[in-house]
From Swiss-Prot:
Record's bilayer topology term: Peripheral membrane protein
Superkingdom of this protein's organism: Bacteria
Keywords, ordered alphabetically: Amino-acid transport, ATP-binding, Cell inner membrane, Cell membrane, Membrane, Nucleotide-binding, Translocase, Transport
Subunit structure, as described in the record: The complex is composed of two ATP-binding proteins (MetN), two transmembrane proteins (MetI) and a solute-binding protein (MetQ).
Protein name: Methionine import ATP-binding protein MetN
Subcellular localization: Cell inner membrane
GO cellular component: plasma membrane
Coiled-coil regions listed in the entry: none
Enzyme Commission (EC) number: 7.4.2.11
Provenance organism: Rhodopseudomonas palustris (strain BisA53)
Domain ABC transporter: from-to ranges: 29-270
Chain sites annotated for binding ATP: 67-74
Principal cellular location given in the protein's record: membrane
Amino acid sequence: MNEIAMNAPWPPHAGATTALASLQPTTGIRIEGVRKVYAARKSSAEVVALDGINLHVPKGSIQGVIGRSGAGKSTLIRLVNGLDKPSEGKVFVNDVEITSLSEPELRQARRSIGMVFQHFNLLSSRTAFGNVALPLEIAGTPKTEIEKRVLPLLDMVGLADKRDRYPAELSGGQKQRVGIARALATEPSVLLSDEATSALDPETTDQILDLLKQINRDLHLTILFITHEMAVVKALADRVAVIEGGRIVEEGSTFDVFATPRHEVTRRFVSSVTGSGAPDWLLAQPHEPPGGKAVLRITFKGSDANQPLLSHIARTLDIDINILSGQVEMIADHPFGTLIVSLTPSPDILRQVIAKLSTNNNLVEQLGYVA
């Protein structure tokens, strides 16, 4: 990146978007009607990567975007940090329309946007200190100021004692911590994360997610991250958008999306971490076998996840209810439980059980039968 361009007068001309002078943005990221189409090549038709994306990320919140490979997640991140432009629509960061900026304006605007990469993108010839200092050097920051900025960042990510280590001497988790510190060097108000934990082991992933939550709390950063892992969404996000085929098919608070997934893609993601999916052996018996039992899946939300509703119903109706599988966990600080149970398939009994369980917005589904 050209240092002269980085230090060009700001704004470069009197008519340049005065929105950039907004000191108190009301929103972190706003995406309006975005469509991204890649032109056709000789051997293939045009590719619609994003189609009608609308997303609002409140300032200071953590927004997850989850989708399978090829769903459009990475394209979305590229549009937010200005590495690419949409075919249609607008992208705003801190109330500034990124999509309308000139190159000098965009370079300046990117200083308020930090980026954390999947594969760290560290320079092997630079120490941890040198990698974190790099964006400040490019921006022409004085050396004395660089040291004042970098050392607290290394301390924040737990690497104060690794300042002189090279990437080859660091673990994967430590490399990502350097990457996070580097992303914070220019004191951004928005942090973008592109699959930041997918190359890490489970324990290190948890540590990095805890670090991102701490940074969000302490620095009041707006965080937008993309992932293909619902466990990451569950651990980190305030809100989540599910993207499929370039469209957002579901969006809401993390708890609501987990508790009541509406789209089939969302249900598959949720069942991968909550155990709420029906096992294959059960789906193979959609009809009642002789002497069989009906199988119900019950999703408990909020305080009901900790209540003895099943035992109360079993006593009241004088029936046996067998628990086949289940778990209770915390999602976005709310209890959430899923149980798969079997019971006598009498229509009258089933009707009463479902009616009693369906109170307080619990979700009850009949999945099939077991012998």
